[in-house]
Amino acid sequence: MDYVDFFKKDHFAMDAGIELKEAKPGYAVACVNVIEKHLNAGGVVQGGLLFTLADLAIAAAANAHGLLAFSIQSDIRFLSSGYLNDILTATATEILLHKTVCHYID
């Protein structure tokens, strides 16, 4: 199965302009070009876009194992801001694969 094509059905991420560049078991890369609709009132990227970008990368890495997977917990720390015309990239890397739970760093 081509997981990049599969995740084109993620309408929320696609409507946000997020593109899945690569997906294989335990690893995925997603990108977004920041446009005006992604900015909050302060002129920086809305945190929801950043979370959605990371979530798509993690979902692709987890689901590329061939079983339908869902996240049970996520948290994010914003280390810097994104701005208009930036290209933002999220890379999900599996750090632990267990029978029922996987852990990813993004």
Language-model features, listed with the residues they occupy:
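Terminal targeting signals and extreme-terminal segments of soluble enzymes
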Residues: 1-105
